[in-house]
Amino acid sequence: MKETRVAYRYAKSLIDLAAENGVLDRVNADMAGIESVFKQNHQLVAVMKNPIVQGDKKHAILEALFGGKVDNFTMSLLSLLTKKHREAVVFEISSEFQRQYREKMGIKIVEVTTTQPITEDQRANFKAIMASKASKVELIEKIDEKILGGFVLKMDDQQIDESVIAKLNKIKNKFTEQVINY
């Protein structure tokens, strides 16, 4: 809970500063990259959360990983976090920043699940389907062979399930109802 509040505040401040200085999109790209690095490297997360590792060593690690590769605002945030002994929440801040960025920009996340990778035409069709629900859409593609075919679209609390397994289950339920009612 405490980490969430801290992450929210730092992310909000960074969004405000980046927007004021016209570097919001660059900083968002940086935060996405930072989140990706932390997701892929659990040892990095462990080091950042380890109270035994000194702050200057953590700063050196962050500098080596991101120095010269991210915007000055982003690097300043990372430096500030190590000075304030908040490096343990870098991952949470990057995730929260992206959530707030999407909210600010009116971008909705749409999860599309299929049995195989989708084509550009299909991607455009899925975006068109969701265009009535949101002006800007970010697709997250997932592969799940359990749906047997078709697709499942999820946005917020809405779901469009056009999968083969859902249709088979619907037929099964109708058949079961008819047998019971017979």
UniProtKB/Swiss-Prot annotation:
Keyword Acetylation recorded: no
A GO molecular-function descriptor: proton-transporting ATP synthase activity, rotational mechanism
GO CC terms: plasma membrane; proton-transporting ATP synthase complex
UniProt-annotated location(s): Cell inner membrane
InterPro entries, alphabetized: ATP_synth_OSCP/delta_N_sf, ATPase_OSCP/dsu
Major localization class: membrane
Keyword vocabulary terms for this entry: ATP synthesis, Cell inner membrane, Cell membrane, CF(1), Hydrogen ion transport, Ion transport, Membrane, Transport
Membrane topology: Peripheral membrane protein
Pfam families: OSCP
Highest taxon, organism lineage: Bacteria
Subunit structure: F-type ATPases have 2 components, F(1) - the catalytic core - and F(0) - the membrane proton channel. F(1) has five subunits: alpha(3), beta(3), gamma(1), delta(1), epsilon(1). F(0) has three main subunits: a(1), b(2) and c(10-14). The alpha and beta chains form an alternating ring which encloses part of the gamma chain. F(1) is attached to F(0) by a central stalk formed by the gamma and epsilon chains, while a peripheral stalk is formed by the delta and b chains.
Family recorded in the similarity comment: Belongs to the ATPase delta chain family.
Known role: F(1)F(0) ATP synthase produces ATP from ADP in the presence of a proton or sodium gradient. F-type ATPases consist of two structural domains, F(1) containing the extramembraneous catalytic core and F(0) containing the membrane proton channel, linked together by a central stalk and a peripheral stalk. During catalysis, ATP synthesis in the catalytic domain of F(1) is coupled via a rotary mechanism of the central stalk subunits to proton translocation.
This protein's name: ATP synthase subunit delta
Organism per entry: Cytophaga hutchinsonii (strain ATCC 33406 / DSM 1761 / CIP 103989 / NBRC 15051 / NCIMB 9469 / D465)
